[in-house]
Amino acid sequence: MSDFIVGLTGGIASGKSALAAEFEKLGVPVVDADLVARQVVAPGPVLDAIVAQFGAEVLLTDGTLDRQTLRQRVFADTAQRRVLEAITHPAIRSELQRAALAALAPYAIVAIPLLTEAGGRAGYPWLDRILVVDVPVALQHQRLMQRDAATAELADRMIAAQATREQRLAIADDVVCNDGVLEQLTQATHRLDADYRARSDR
């Protein structure tokens, strides 16, 4: 059972998955909020609440969530995005904590893209450390256009819909700069792993 939990966050296209993969190579369990978010919107009470708020047009013909339709709606409307987060975040938080505590390791990483937007440590008081993957906004923009084939306008909207780089850095206990050099990412992971293992033994 892990009694030391690190929250990993960063902006869209910052390289959170790449950093999480480096920790996994060292045997560290990683609980992914994106995966948990997909699980909690499977047919059930959370999906029912989403449909009640946004209408049946956010469902596919098989009764599952049409993620693309819902994503387009909430990115276009800040108020609707907040409504969606109010429905999904409590269920996601609960499952993330349960999975992290159940991990059989000295510590666990919980990857939470919207950690800053959800109030940082106030929203997740059970986190022992917050690790931020930092990347210049221009590089985020470039990666979104390459990775997701996003238009420049959509990339701007996706970045603007999240917390600012400065807001993320303000909640960080630890920061890793991910400018695309894998060797530097690996070195940073090894350094942090040693630190977290030492802290978990205290």
Swiss-Prot record:
UniProt key word Cytoplasm: yes
InterPro entries documented for this protein: Depp_CoAkinase, P-loop_NTPase
BP GO annotations: coenzyme A biosynthetic process
Keywords assigned: ATP-binding, Coenzyme A biosynthesis, Cytoplasm, Kinase, Nucleotide-binding, Transferase
Binding site for ATP: A13, S14, G15, K16, S17, A18
Recorded GO CC terms: cytoplasm
Protein location: Cytoplasm
Annotated pathway: Cofactor biosynthesis; coenzyme A biosynthesis; CoA from (R)-pantothenate: step 5/5
DPCK domain: residues covered: 5-202
Enzyme Commission (EC) number: 2.7.1.24
The reaction(s) this protein catalyses: 3'-dephospho-CoA + ATP = ADP + CoA + H(+)
Pfam families reported for this sequence: CoaE
GO molecular function: ATP binding; dephospho-CoA kinase activity
Main location: cytoplasm
CDD domains xrefs: DPCK
HAMAP family, per the entry: Dephospho_CoA_kinase
Family statement: Belongs to the CoaE family.
Protein role: Catalyzes the phosphorylation of the 3'-hydroxyl group of dephosphocoenzyme A to form coenzyme A.
Protein name stated in the entry: Dephospho-CoA kinase
Species per Swiss-Prot/TrEMBL record: Xanthomonas oryzae pv. oryzae (strain KACC10331 / KXO85)
